[in-house]
Amino acid sequence: MTINLGTANEFIARHIGPRAADEQAMLTALGFDSLDAMTAAVIPDSIKGTSVLGSHDGQSEADALAALKAIAGKNQLFKSYIGQGYYNTHTPAPILRNLLENPAWYTAYTPYQPEISQGRLEALLNFQTLISDLTGLPIANASLLDEATAAAEAMTFCKRLSKNKSSHAFFASVHCHPQTLDVLRTRAEPLGIEVVVGDERELGDVSAFFGALLQYPASNGEVFDYREVVQRFHAANALVAVAADLLALTLLTPPGEFDADVAIGSAQRFGVPLGFGGPHAAYFATRDAFKRDMPGRLVGVSIDRFGKTALRLAMQTREQHIRREKATSNICTAQVLLANIASMFAVYHGPAGLKRIAERTHALTAILAAGLKALGVQVVGASAFDTLTLATGTATASLHDKARAQGINLRQIDAAHVGLSLDETSTQADVESLWQLLGGEQAQPDFTALAASTGSLLPAALLRQSAILEHPVFNRYHSETELMRYLRRLADKDLALDRSMIPLGSCTMKLNAASEMIPVTWAEFGNLHPFAPAEQSQGYLQMTTELEAMLCAATGYDAVSLQPNAGSQGEYAGLLAIRAYHRSRGEGHRDICLIPSSAHGTNPATAHMAGMRVVVTACDARGNVDVEDLRAKAIEHRERLAAIMITYPSTHGVFEEAIGEICAIIHDNGGQVYIDGANMNAMVGLCAPGKFGGDVSHLNLHKTFCIPHGGGGPGVGPIGVKSHLAPFLPGHAQLENTQGAVCAAPFGSASILPITWMYIRMMGGAGLKRASQMAILNANYIARRLEEHYPVLYTGGNGLVAHECILDLRPLKDTSGISVDDVAKRLIDFGFHAPTMSFPVAGTLMIEPTESESKEELDRFCNAMIQIREEIRAVEDGSLDKDDNPLKNAPHTAAELVGEWTHGYSREQAVYPLASLVEGKYWPPVGRVDNVFGDRNLVCACPSIESYQDA
């Protein structure tokens, strides 16, 4: 007997759901004898053979983890005092184990279906309440991508709302974090905004500005009193945004109390690891009067059909998927998983615990400053919370060298100054080691004596007087037992991939394998500061370099930037690259962006942000781009044509035959081709956008490449470009190219990039190709099983779809009154998250099963949809009442089941419509949520404790 003595790679079979026999059965149902034959029928001839991925084998889970561990070991974890918006923190173990590492939390989707999302909606409402309380502003959103992009959103927010309409100048304090100023400049330039950086203490006339950004405390550590300067800006009809440190706000007067219009910042230091720069949750808070102009998602309190308190995403008409180029922002994701960590950090510690952390951090800072002064070191400024700037003169360079020799990183400010930031993890020993480092051979100060004699460095006039976090949720769960059970109760309310498939079209809710997730919490990746010297981040640099090469091979592009920390930011970076390319050729006048009418709303919103004008092109009856209309508009605008943004396979789930011709039309008329990579899961290993006409694409690593959705973030949206666009990829002050940063950190959400590295390394080229093929097979199998019950709206010329299919429910609305919303809510009773509703066509469901779902799960979903069709028939023929039926009343709760039953159908039909549900039943915690009530009676902070008790 021959035994394979190598490490067997079973990962591909673990990742892909259907077994060999199931695969063959599905192929037979479609009329094919092999996966390759089916693929050949789906992929257009014009783009076959464009893949350059290769067919190399992947590594086993154990071998890939070992290889990545060796790479991670090349990162050097020095003691960091760099600060600058990034701080060491302790992630409480119960939050790490029960939230961050829990698939019930990290595999969930954005809570657009509120009935199956009450748990994470409550956690996000806690986050909003936390932010509102600490900032002193009444309304806060459910997180943004990072502090720098939140500042950029605040800038455009001020532009929209300022009454100084003739102004195009925005004041940014020189005391803001440098990475924030860099992103402001990137965002401002295409919009014709001038960013004026200066010292607000030296400002004279402010009438030229529509808005201002101030840092609180300042990046150099000082705590300035902004009350007078805010009044001056307001007198000039300008709005004021304040970038505030949340921990400091537990002790300092909040921005809302000195009349700031907006507060933004990062929640990273509330339990979220440094992660070489991300992902972290930013926040955005503002006045109630401005709520409809606020970017990002907003959780609001509403009621369900029984009048019971229920949560939902509020005011969605602000979002880009609805308002397109008129949207407040192109942001379509948030940082939900990280916001939930931060919110639970506050829940666990409570107001007293947060203040203790802040007071201890500040006390250590004050003692450190007193000791340094005693040693003759010049401390700049009289006030501080946790950060000190030291005037070190000509000794600065040697001081950095000496510090690194001792395993310490100081902040590099300039040739004559260094910075020090303390944090939650700082100790007496740290303070004493800094005295020793900076004091040379002098005798050390007496820590105990200084602790007894040193007072606060916070200005007395700015000490916080208002209470924080008085809601019971922040004062109840302080034992680990209570927090563990609270997190479990919330998770039990939600439907995530750990319960059932999430068949959302255009979202690619595939497996997020445990072996891919494990490296995220390794200290070597989690505890590195993004601005640590390059020699200390060699592990990250090797991993990112290898990942860039992997993504180039998968897409056919020549270069990749990993910086964009969401798909929307990848789109933006891609269009900026196109814009910069045209300008480099003396064609800066090219500003027309063609976008098909079927495109996701992010595309036109992004084009607007990049300073382009959107021209919409038509689609034909089969959902394809109308090539003749495209040609006519490309020719009409040829002198100003900048780009086309096109999704491939199409947003309608079809491989359009004319994609090569479309690319040629744009190139012939002087434009560049932006191919949206949202649907890349149908192409990896089969065809490559960089080889069939694309100049740039963004990829959604949280779709195709296995980063989990986290309940609505994090995401990663790297861009791939052809060589002529490579010089225009995003830069960063920490990189060789210092211009054009689109987010705060050089590698964006760096600490989750190992997930994609692991996925590609384990799958190999052959496995990635097979994943694409199986995604296409699963989608076509569902379409074939359901086509006799629901019309499949779009197919290719061969009657096949790509990796997703669209079911048309509009005829059923006409015959039965049953809407797509009714079907979506009824699926909850069957234990399923609804497919994508009414996108890209109103009244339809778009289904994407991915390659990870087994045939059994596909059949379970199909059986549910078929049973729902039978219920619709019963409404059509009068067997079920048109108003009182299981669809109109869905979803059904356990409380309703045990109460008085007045419906004209049975309890069993309501909650056990299929016998298979008896084995495992998901019970929604609320009935159908009233969206209109929630928007008319907007409440975006924690409701009374009685509401929680009722729940």
Swiss-Prot record:
List of residues that carry N6-(pyridoxal phosphate)lysine: K703
Protein's job: The glycine cleavage system catalyzes the degradation of glycine. The P protein binds the alpha-amino group of glycine through its pyridoxal phosphate cofactor; CO(2) is released and the remaining methylamine moiety is then transferred to the lipoamide cofactor of the H protein.
One GO BP annotation of this record: glycine decarboxylation via glycine cleavage system
Enzyme class: oxidoreductase
Stated family: Belongs to the GcvP family.
InterPro entries linked to this entry: GcvP (IPR003437), GDC-P_C (IPR049316), GDC-P_N (IPR049315), GDC_P (IPR020581), PyrdxlP-dep_Trfase (IPR015424), PyrdxlP-dep_Trfase_major (IPR015421), PyrdxlP-dep_Trfase_small (IPR015422)
Keywords recorded for this protein, A-Z: Oxidoreductase, Pyridoxal phosphate
Entry's EC annotation: 1.4.4.2
Cofactor(s) required, per the database record: pyridoxal 5'-phosphate
Domain of life assignment: Bacteria
Subunit structure: The glycine cleavage system is composed of four proteins: P, T, L and H.
Protein name, entry field: Glycine dehydrogenase (decarboxylating) 1
NCBIfam families: gcvP (TIGR00461), PRK04366.1 (NF003346)
Gene name of this polypeptide: gcvP1
GO molecular function, one term: pyridoxal phosphate binding
A Pfam family reported for this protein in Swiss-Prot or TrEMBL: GDC-P
SUPFAM superfamilies: PLP-dependent transferases (SSF53383)
Catalytic reactions on record: N(6)-[(R)-lipoyl]-L-lysyl-[glycine-cleavage complex H protein] + glycine + H(+) = N(6)-[(R)-S(8)-aminomethyldihydrolipoyl]-L-lysyl-[glycine-cleavage complex H protein] + CO2
Record PANTHER family: GLYCINE DEHYDROGENASE (DECARBOXYLATING), MITOCHONDRIAL (PTHR11773:SF1), GLYCINE DEHYDROGENASE, DECARBOXYLATING (PTHR11773)
GO cellular component terms, A-Z: cytosol; glycine cleavage complex
Coiled coil, from the record: none
Signal sequence region: none
